Regions:
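Active-site neighborhood of HAD-like aspartate-dependent phosphohydrolases
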Residues: 1-41
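Short, acidic loop-to-helix structural element flanking the phosphoryl-transfer center
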Residues: 32-36, 43-73, 80-87, 108-111
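Residues at the starts of beta-strands that form the adenosine-phosphate
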Residues: 71-72, 120, 142
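Substrate-recognition "cap/lid" segment bordering the active-site pocket of phosphatases
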Residues: 79-122, 128-137
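Short acidic-hydrophobic, aromatic-tinged amphipathic segments that line or gate anion-handling sites
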Residues: 98-104, 161-175
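Short, charged, surface-exposed secondary-structure boundary motifs
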Residues: 107-112, 152-160, 175-177
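Short amphipathic alpha-helix with an adjacent loop that forms part of the alpha/beta core around
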Residues: 110-116, 170-183
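Acidic, Mg2+-coordinating phosphoryl-transfer loop and its flanking beta/alpha structural elements
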Residues: 123-165
Length: 184
């Protein structure tokens, strides 16, 4: 969706690494967008498109299945300014789960969420640095590194602390359930 948004705004995405630094280019000249332009495009995308993001293929069905085994909470670094847009978007996509907006690394937030929690916990994220943050702050949490974005996968660093690295939503569900059965 971000690449489509950039195209509508006469830019394109040219990833050469995991980060967006220098990855947004002017479509006509191939020049790297200025930092201000890149920032404006990212924020424009967030403000205009959060409420209409599509679901990753298989995500609603997988979460529905996982809901039979666990309480699902979505911890997202979606900005507070579009929190309600994201809640509405997720509800429209049949993923009506509690959403907590976070800023920065997710390890401390997960630690706070789990403060009085005794059952097995899982953390699933596509960002390897968030997985590492949660792993370092919450050693008992099973950390899952998972992305369905083929555009980013070639540049994705290995996630420190990830004990599960599924290849699809179906694989994630299978490994999650297997992990719970092994725990009994």
């Amino acid at each position: 969706p971000f690449a489509i948004y950039l195209k509508k705004h006469a830019h394109r995405l040219h990833l050469t690494g995991y980060r967006l630094d220098n990855a947004i280019k002017k479509a006509k000249t191939d020049e790297v967008a200025t930092p201000d332009t890149a920032k404006d495009l990212v924020w424009g995308f967030i403000n205009e498109e959060t409420k209409i993001q599509p679901a990753a293929k298989g995500a609603p069905q997988a979460l529905e299945k996982l809901q039979e085994y666990a309480q699902i909470i979505i911890l997202s670094n979606v900005p507070y300014s579009v929190h309600n847009d994201r809640v509405a978007n997720l509800k429209d996509l049949n993923m009506d789960y509690p959403l907590i907006s976070n800023e920065g690394m997710k390890g401390p937030a997960v630690k706070e969420i789990l403060k009085n929690h005794k059952a097995q916990s899982f953390f699933i994220d596509d960002n390897p640095y968030q997985v590492e943050s949660v792993y370092k702050d919450n050693q008992q949490t099973v950390c899952v590194h998972f992305s369905v974005c083929d555009l980013v996968k070639p540049y994705m660093p290995k996630a420190v602390g990830a004990s599960i690295e599924p290849t699809s939503w179906e694989d994630l569900v299978s490994k999650f359930i297997g992990c719970l059965k092994d725990d009994k």
